[in-house]
Amino acid sequence: MWGVSSLDYDDDEELTRLLAVWDDEPLSLFLMNTFLLHQEGFRNLPFTVLRLSYAYRIFAKMLRAHGTPVAEDFMTRVAALARDEGLRDILGQRHAAEASRAEIAEALERVAERCDDRHGGSDDYVWLSRLLDLAPNYRQVELFQLLEKESRGQSRNSVWHLLRMDTVSATKFYEAFVSGCLPGAAAADGSGGGGSHYTGSRAGVSPGIQFGIKHEGLVKTLVECYVMHGREPVRDGLGLLIDPTSGLLGASMDLCFGVLKQGSGRTLLVEPCARVYEIKCRYKYLRKKEDPFVQNVLRRHDAAAVASLLQSHPVPGVEFRGERETPSAREFLLSHDAALFRATLKRARPLKPPEPLREYLADLLYLNKAECSEVIVFDAKHLSDDNSDGDATITINASLGLAAGDAAGGGADHHLRGSPGDSPPPIPFEDENTPELLGRLNVYEVARFSLPAFVNPRHQYYFQMLIQQYVLSQYYIKKHPDPERIDFRDLPTVYLVSAIFREREESELGCELLAGGRVFHCDHIPLLLIVTPVVFDPQFTRHAVSTVLDRWSRDLSRKTNLPIWVPNSANEYVVSSVPRPVSP
């Protein structure tokens, strides 16, 4: 299940023991122990190689402490670089005044053998860092790709938790940018920042988070079959993607399309026009089917019915603001449509946006307000029921046919430029060809339509998706054969998916749920998805990324008394994100 170790990471006590290895030597202590006496040339070592060296050291200590290999593919690749004769020769020539080639080779061999260096061996990691700095850039990117592979499974994987300790993750970027709360520089917790101890048990997790965890798999299938119409996503998900240009920013993504796992190492390859779907399950809208607002959606299935449902909660899921009004940060969807959402005006009192965002907020609102969400309404029924509505039956089979045929067979058209709302043609239904549907609750599409709602750039989710898009774009840029000729339309795009469920009726209790040809044992039935495209301003992304990287490096420099250099490739990102001037 884990792919990195035979240890049972469902055991919080075992995971806590592993994290104690990190706690015994956090990043700041490692840097001071290793480099305070070797500051000559340290300024030229980018944080990317320091991060890779530190990861290798922690994983080696975990092996010695527990006798179990962890992140073996990453460890093997770093050890191979440490034994590379060409890199050793260059290193020996550049630092001949400090040590002989034999001494350097001996130190690197100890690193490759993962020897215990508690007795005066900290110089070994000075040489490893310098050697990694000499390695070609694509080799460094490959090492970060291996860390992503080693952390797949996310919260169920100890490597994922360890890597987040020293990462400004997408979920924590908003606080790092707005308030200067810097996760990972000095302390960390199981969510990636701000605290000193991991709390892995779900006993204290809120009902809303538990609800999202239970239903995320079903929502992913609905997106695959009804939004992407059977195009293949990244199976088994991705781990933590650490920005290969800074070594600091990181993102864990819910659902990706246009990202492949290639070669024997199964490292990721980002294709043109990749898509990221960030999933949010709206627990606060869980209602019974007989609820009048739910019935209104199922009966009318139009924008007005959905708007009424969203406004039925004391904190409406879509906040209305006038064209020139500043939104609050309470909800992640906004609307300027007074006819549908006027009632929310009095419920959320606007505040001044935080200072780092104030100059850019109007432009971000302008870019996103032109976008419209797509709503897909669902219901479920027993296929064995008497049914005079042939259209509903056809709709069921159309979606299942795509999931079973186009998704598995690949289909002829796998480009990702098309609109997520493009619907496939219906497929004729035949009972005798689909016996697996009988006796189960089959999810089918009732209707789809537009909703005048767009993402709120003041909300923390906007910043979470900003970092997801930025990090994935950097992997695409770094692996592109001709980065100077990248078409900005080929960079990854991000969509926000809001999923609303309903409770089961008495006749639906105990029945398996079938969606996209897959069986689910969810307690609830999907009612609707709201799919919202997210637009980013490359100039603002550069400002936000640069602010956080600079703030974090200065903070760590102060703690370690070392000149920490965190590389910043936001300018290259901007160049790739804007249209190129037309040649005369």
Curated annotation (Swiss-Prot):
InterPro entries: Herpes_alk_exo (IPR001616), Restrct_endonuc-II-like (IPR011335), Viral_alk_exo (IPR034720). Keywords: Endonuclease, Exonuclease, Host cytoplasm, Host nucleus, Host-virus interaction, Hydrolase, Nuclease. It is an enzyme of class 3 (hydrolase). It is found in: Host nucleus; Host cytoplasm. Its main location: host cell. Its EC number is 3.1.-.-. The keyword rRNA processing does not apply. The record marks 216, 254, 278, 280 as: Required for function. GO terms for molecular function: DNA binding; endonuclease activity; exonuclease activity. GO terms for cellular component: host cell cytoplasm; host cell nucleus. Pfam families: Viral_alk_exo. Residues 409-430 are annotated as: Disordered. Belongs to the herpesviridae alkaline nuclease family. Plays a role in processing non linear or branched viral DNA intermediates in order to promote the production of mature packaged unit-length linear progeny viral DNA molecules. Exhibits endonuclease and exonuclease activities and accepts both double-stranded and single-stranded DNA as substrate. Exonuclease digestion of DNA is in the 5'-> 3' direction and the products are 5'-monophosphate nucleosides. Additionally, forms a recombinase with the major DNA-binding protein, which displays strand exchange activity. Interacts with major DNA-binding protein; this interaction increases the nuclease processivity of the alkaline exonuclease. This is Alkaline nuclease. It comes from Human cytomegalovirus (strain AD169). The gene is UL98.
